[in-house]
Amino acid sequence: ELLNYWYAPEQEFGLAVRTGWAMLRSLGFLLLIGHVKRGRVVAKPFGLILSVTTVFAVGRLVVPRAGVPPLPGLLGFAVLTALCVAVVVLLYRSEAVGAHLVRHRKGLVVEGGVISWREVVPKRPPVTGWLLTARVAAFTYSPLMLVPALVATGSILDGRISAVPAVLFWFAAGIAVSYAVLFCTAFLLRDRRWARKLLVVITLTTLAVDLPLCWWLLGADGLIRDGAPLVTAALLTLYSLHR
């Protein structure tokens, strides 16, 4: 990301925001490493959505507004894509990794008058991997809305005062989506049928709000760069719910 930012023709505000967001994903991969080390079941869907959205997040940085992408950026993107593919293949195709990812989170357990810190098996019925994937993918809606909203503040700094209400609405919608997804997925993991339908409604509403704002405030370039990752996450959510 730093190489691409350095070689970019224009180090503008939007590129800086997108570069920072892409670099924050390094923390996401550290979190993924922690989940794998502890054998957590959630590592598979988390690794899948993290890898897919990372490729999109960095890919939109490589392509300039005009001309051909610089060679260092292309090489870095190729290496990053290969690494993300390797992560997904290991999580979903490796029998050794699959046999390791069977643990649940630890917590305080009171049994026989003794308090201990150990693995807590959820009381709810076993959750399928696709439901977990839908949950993790849906949780990306909020940041994928807030990042372009932050990019759009650059137009306000450039004197486009008329965009203030739309940008504020964009931020509010991004925050509201996070709470809606949190509420919905809590019941989704309990396999409530209405929660599936509600998540579909949330997904379609998110797209209906975010994509027009991307086009209006960021143009066709912003629609592709910032809309495509959200569309990908939405399609993955809908596909996971269908499975």
Where in the sequence are the language-model features?
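Topology signature of small-to-medium multi-pass alpha-helical membrane proteins
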Residues: 1-243
